[in-house]
Amino acid sequence: MVTRHRVTVLYNAPEDIGNHMRQNDTHLTVRGGSGVVLQQRWLLERTGSLDKSFTRITWRPRADLARSLSVIENELSAGFSVYSNSSDVPERFITNPVYNSFHSEKFDIEQYLPPEVDLNLSWNPEDFTYDISVEPTQIQIVEYRLLKQGEEFTIARVKDEKLEVGVFFVDASDESDVDIGGIRCNWRMDDGKMERCQKTSLLYKQGHIAYNHSTTTTSLYLNEPIGLHPKIMIDLTDFEERPKCMYLMHLQLPLELFIDKFQSSPLLLFGEDDLELPEYSLRDKAWGSESIFELKAGTMNEVTLHTRYIEPSNNKGDKLEVSFDPEVILACDTGDNKVSRNPFYKKGLGYESLFTDDTTFRHLNSTTLLVPIPRPDTKDYSKIKNGTLLCLLISIIYIFSKVFGNNKKKRSVKRE
């Protein structure tokens, strides 16, 4: 089986290509620098698969949220996410009309990747971002990484692989359209030698526009003091309503937090939203909940969350810090099919599949928020138990003294 392997390197300026690249008959080496991004894409054909469902697996390290994304990258949700439209719902997945989903902070790729994937990949979840699509006829694995100052990356064709490399710089771009230029190199299948590299250019419209490429961003924070009912504050006072656009907030909440749909009125809410059950009684049922809220421009928006009772611990501290990563997005219908022609973006499962194909997503903020939740300590169990029994005993004695003491006094009163 032939694997198609595409490598893309993006530099800041045209002169960087010549200064940071060298080659011979079989190998090409690129050198890193400030803001240099390396993308690898593997495309594997599937034959004889009986599974007709689609699955998307994404991973983005939380530290990556603070990094300025390039125009060949897509804004993914932080953490590990799996989306599937299979009729068989796996354990702990939540469902909506379009897909089933799972979200976690743990990179657990081997559990969800099909067994036929054997590329000897060196997974690096601490530094790399992954976007994987599993379809009935093919599997696509996309890996993003920074190529840092002084770091080198050498590319050469391996057996049964069709290799193509593009080395680009950003020629021009605005908030939606991108024009990149550079060179494209191919390797011959028979002897593994490089063909002559050709000049090339690409013009496309971005599906996801990173917040660092937007002219305006919004502040996103938790109202202080946080308490048991934390309030997310989204400041859109400097924004105006746009035609065919919606300001949205996308939330993936762990079990320790939940939305009261009768109080907050989300646009969409899937997963665990029970108002009474503690966190530990839901662990085997679902990972949490996913929701989308519509926000109003020109004002301060507020979304109230609620905390669940969590399982007591043994000397692990009196509070559990729960983290989540809200995404504030401006979703717009463009009426333009250029989005589908973007060579670095393919619309897949996830919240974007709930919108039309011509929708672009302008990311205004994505911030990690922390909620401290009080946690009982089992070492205090005896103290609490004995204290409760003592209070109960005193209460019983007091009640009996009042009832029987008053009756005795009344009987001892002498009537004239």
Swiss-Prot record:
It comes from the Eukaryota. One of its GO terms (biological process) is protein processing. Keywords: Endoplasmic reticulum, Glycoprotein, GPI-anchor biosynthesis, Membrane, Transmembrane, Transmembrane helix. The chain crosses the membrane at residues 386-405. It is a single-pass type III membrane protein. It is found in: Endoplasmic reticulum membrane. InterPro entries: Pbn1, PIG-X/PBN1. Pfam families: PIG-X (PF08320). Residues 1-385 are lumenal. Pathway: Glycolipid biosynthesis; glycosylphosphatidylinositol-anchor biosynthesis. N-glycosylated. PANTHER family: PROTEIN PBN1. Belongs to the PIGX family. Present with 4930 molecules/cell in log phase SD medium. This is Protein PBN1. It comes from Saccharomyces cerevisiae (strain ATCC 204508 / S288c) (Baker's yeast). The lineage of its organism: Eukaryota, Fungi, Dikarya, Ascomycota, Saccharomycotina.
